[in-house]
């Protein structure tokens, strides 16, 4: 990712699991004597709104008519909340899911393929019966053609709408001879969080799938987020650009395509360092950011967060330090509502060899898993 601005018919599973598609209002005249003051007021209001919206709207958010369709639901009862939190397993998150990801996994490398297969196998092993698809493709890069592959897991592909959680699993390429870069925060921890959430809520998700809930959970593990040479529109976001374009072409009921089925796109990036701060980047999804903030407060009051001395430490009010180019951009440009959970300012270890397991802060990782688990349970009505 790169920081900028002021401061990133239905789907069918092929034999090999590769993604492929199935075959003006009336106006009333006003008295002339009242028209001039009204026009003046409108002009002043319009100018103010133009200035405000240009400042307040984040990177390339499109003012499309499609709005979030799920109303805010009630908070989980305390007993249910405690059960959800209790189903998370910090040792499983760390040992089973995170450590296998802490390898060099640049696009096209053996480590990248190893991690991709690990993600696919883990998702297929869950009781809920996820619909797991691969999106392999070859793209032109400054280094020549490179093979990439996204992993897409949808709990119920027949559901009308999707709550989509996404992260990238590739690691940044450094020159030969450099210290190996494993990208613990960038983005091994986000990938491990998604796997742990799916495992911890496995039974609840199975039940939701059996009941044909109208909104289902979808997980995207994206390849090629990092630039291979120098960040630019053609050298970055390879996986998200390819997948967003593909999803835009695949029909989905009630339609018209799978991109429209995404009700909320939550992107996780740069997580795992101590004392992260998150800001709402887009007015369109601020209600969901506030929900995360409320969950953080509630878990703190219930003494369910570790190394968390203040009621709110993570989800901060106010404006972010600047816009960030990241894997949400291709989806945002297609009108998808985005909630970007990225630590800003970036962790001190960002894009350095120090972005390792040793510099992660386990209490923060586990706190985030608890906040996200409660958010999913409330959003999906689990």
From Swiss-Prot:
GO terms for cellular component: Golgi membrane. It catalyses: N-terminal L-glutaminyl-[peptide] = N-terminal 5-oxo-L-prolyl-[peptide] + NH4(+). The active site is at 225 (proton acceptor), 269 (proton acceptor). The keyword Transferase applies. Pfam families: Peptidase_M28 (PF04389). Disulfide bonds join 167-191. The keyword Hydrolase does not apply. Signal peptide: none annotated. Keywords: Acyltransferase, Disulfide bond, Golgi apparatus, Membrane, Metal-binding, Transferase, Transmembrane, Transmembrane helix, Zinc. The chain crosses the membrane at residues 35-55. Zn(2+) binds at residues 186, 226, 351. Its EC number is 2.3.2.5. GO terms for molecular function: glutaminyl-peptide cyclotransferase activity; zinc ion binding. It is found in: Golgi apparatus membrane. It is a single-pass type I membrane protein. GO terms for biological process: peptidyl-pyroglutamic acid biosynthetic process, using glutaminyl-peptide cyclotransferase. Belongs to the glutaminyl-peptide cyclotransferase family. PANTHER family: GLUTAMINYL-PEPTIDE CYCLOTRANSFERASE, GLUTAMINYL-PEPTIDE CYCLOTRANSFERASE-LIKE PROTEIN. Responsible for the biosynthesis of pyroglutamyl peptides. This is Glutaminyl-peptide cyclotransferase-like protein. It comes from Macaca fascicularis. The gene is QPCTL.
């Amino acid at each position: 990712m790169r920081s900028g601005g002021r401061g990133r018919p239905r789907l069918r599973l092929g034999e090999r699991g590769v993604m492929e598609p199935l075959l003006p209002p009336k106006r009333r005249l006003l008295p002339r004597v009242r028209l001039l003051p009204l026009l003046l007021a409108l002009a002043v209001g319009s100018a103010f709104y133009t200035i405000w919206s240009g400042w307040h709207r984040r990177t390339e958010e499109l003012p499309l008519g499609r709005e979030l369709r799920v109303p805010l639901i009630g908070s989980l009862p305390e007993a249910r909340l405690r059960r959800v939190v209790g189903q998370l397993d910090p040792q499983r998150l760390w040992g089973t899911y995170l450590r296998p990801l802490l390898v060099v996994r640049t696009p096209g490398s053996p480590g990248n393929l190893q991690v991709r297969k690990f993600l696919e196998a883990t998702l297929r092993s869950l009781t809920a019966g996820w619909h797991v698809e691969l999106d392999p493709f070859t793209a032109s890069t400054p280094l020549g053609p490179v093979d990439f592959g996204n992993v897409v897991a949808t709990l119920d592909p027949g559901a009308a709408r999707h709550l989509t959680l996404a992260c990238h699993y590739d690691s940044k390429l450094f020159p030969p001879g450099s210290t190996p870069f494993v990208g613990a925060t960038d983005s091994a921890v986000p990938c491990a969080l998604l796997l742990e959430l799916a495992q911890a809520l496995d039974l609840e998700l199975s039940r939701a799938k059996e009941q044909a809930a109208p909104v289902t959970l979808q997980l995207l593990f994206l390849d090629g987020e990092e630039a291979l040479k120098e960040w630019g529109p053609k050298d970055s976001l390879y996986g998200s650009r390819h997948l967003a374009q593909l999803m835009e072409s695949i029909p989905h009921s009630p339609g018209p395509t799978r991109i429209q089925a995404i009700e909320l796109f939550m992107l996780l990036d740069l997580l795992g360092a101590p004392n992260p701060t998150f800001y709402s980047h887009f007015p369109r999804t601020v209600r969901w950011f506030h929900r995360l903030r409320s969950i953080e407060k509630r878990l703190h009051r219930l003494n369910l967060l570790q190394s968390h001395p203040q009621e709110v430490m993570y989800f901060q009010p106010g404006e972010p330090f600047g816009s960030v180019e990241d894997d949400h951009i291709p989806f945002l440009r297609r009108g998808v509502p985005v909630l970007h959970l990225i630590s800003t300012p970036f962790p001190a270890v960002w894009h350095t060899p120090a972005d390792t397991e040793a510099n992660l802060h386990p209490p923060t990782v586990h706190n985030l898993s608890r906040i996200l688990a409660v958010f999913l349970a409330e959003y999906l009505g689990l």
